[in-house]
């Protein structure tokens, strides 16, 4: 019984480690900036292929960032960002881990 439980925990842990959770973003979540960033950066623990990044500025509808040229699985992304508006931004991302697991998340920042 103990062996079976230990095996199940080992299988679960190896699957959990195969995913690539988000470690860092620039701007950081809830950051307050003095100027609009020129790029959005993501840092993942393992490799991931971003499939969609949507930016929503305050009450406006979201728009997708251009991910052409980002066809590989990477740990770090720096995606060009063009805006000249102050206010609050919501960044929503979606990606695929090397193990086939779909991941997503979001973070916010504002520009004064």
Give a label for each model feature.
Residues 1-4:
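Bacterial N-terminal signal peptides that target proteins for export
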Residues 16-25:
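Cleaved targeting-peptide boundary
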Residues 22, 33-35, 41-111:
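Acidic, low-complexity Ser/Thr/Gly/Pro-rich repeat segments typical of extracellular/periplasmic
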């Amino acid at each position: 019984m103990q062996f079976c439980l230990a095996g199940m925990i080992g299988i679960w842990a190896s699957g959990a480690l195969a995913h690539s959770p988000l470690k860092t973003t620039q701007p950081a979540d809830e950051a307050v900036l003095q100027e609009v960033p020129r790029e959005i950066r993501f840092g993942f623990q393992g490799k991931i292929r971003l499939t969609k990044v949507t930016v929503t500025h305050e009450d406006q509808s979201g728009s997708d960032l251009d991910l052409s040229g980002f066809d590989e699985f990477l740990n770090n992304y720096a995606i060009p960002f063009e805006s000249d508006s102050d206010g609050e931004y919501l960044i929503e991302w979606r990606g695929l881990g090397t193990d086939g697991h779909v991941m997503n998340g979001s973070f916010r920042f504002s520009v004064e």
